[in-house]
Amino acid sequence: MKSSFASGAAALGFWLAAVAPLPAAAWQLTPEATAVERGMAAPNRLRRAINGGAFRAMAMVGHPVHEEITRQALQCPSEGPLAPGCEFDIRYQEAGVRWNDDPAFKFLPGRGKFPDCQSGTVRMVTQPLCWAQVFLSGERSARRGVQFTGANSNLLVRSHFGDLQFLHAMAVSDGETPEQTRRNVMAWLEFTWRTSIGEAKFDSQRMVARLPVDGFAERFRHNQGWRIQDLFSLGNPAVRTEEAIQRIALGSLLHVVQDSFAAGHVEREAPVSGVVCAGRTDWPAPGQILEFHSYPHQDSRKHGRADEPHGLEAHLAGARPHVIDVVRTVAELWRARTPWDDARPYLECVFTLSPTARVSSPGNSYRSDAPGDQVQWGG
């Protein structure tokens, strides 16, 4: 659940990674913007926010781990020849991978009364001080037991602390059954997949609350006017083409898949050699899921350490398939424009529950009252 904003200057990204870790999300997000986002950014404002320590209290922002996984999977490995389907321009997919951590939003009427918030669209790159204040306020409220939905909050807070935490492969609250979390995850994967392949009833002008996806009518009933385009491109007219929206939707799906391999989000068993998905030998099965964690009662810094580059390196050195293997398989299915009914068996396999799967909790290694354990990526 982390982020990374690649502004034009590498020094700015270094400053942010070194000085300003944010509260935890999943694989980390860096405060550097993609090329797609840079046109929206106010670089001087962002620099002042960083230099002023706006993000110092947060552990979720630091290194561009999500982006690195996406690049390795879609732009193909450094070893060996360039394989068919390897891409160079993945800017929209990267924007989508970042969207789950930093969805653009506008305040509900009567809300948004933070000192540094202005009218209009809020994102880390456009209103960084406002963004940090909203995030930290949401985190504090969630720890007090406030439940966030479309009735009382915005996308940023809902996705990190509220009813949309499944955007990071996490449970909405402690004690949620693994079956319920999995249903929420699979509903989002269905929506983003069908959008990403350009399915007829999932074009950018469709109303999100009316989509034929389990749970969407209830989840977005307070957002009746939202189109798919509004969800993924609020405040950014430059990406309002069908192709751009499709690739952003794919990136959002990849974020959920990637987060499911981050140990601060999901506890998995180790993969078992020879076990495959849906009887296909070219689909080796990842480790089964033992628990979806929930964030509000986690220690944000422990969560954040699990999302750093060393955590990814340890994960990639373990048993396969690892997260990059899985993302590559998903990308291959997407390039073939595989219909949802044919792609679903693989994604269901990626989120297979162990027979001993438990209800959600912060996770023993991530509780705010637990000793400082070494944390790492899941199996």
Walk through the language-model features, giving the residues of each:
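Bacterial N-terminal signal peptides that target proteins for export
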Residues: M1-L12
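N-terminal signal peptide c-region/cleavage motif recognized by signal peptidases
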Residues: V19-P21
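N-terminal, motif-rich segments that launch catalysis or mediate targeting to/interaction with membranes
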Residues: A25-I245, A263-G379
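Active-site alpha-helix of zinc metalloproteases
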Residues: R247, G251
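Catalytic glutamate of the conserved HExxH
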Residues: S252, V256, S260
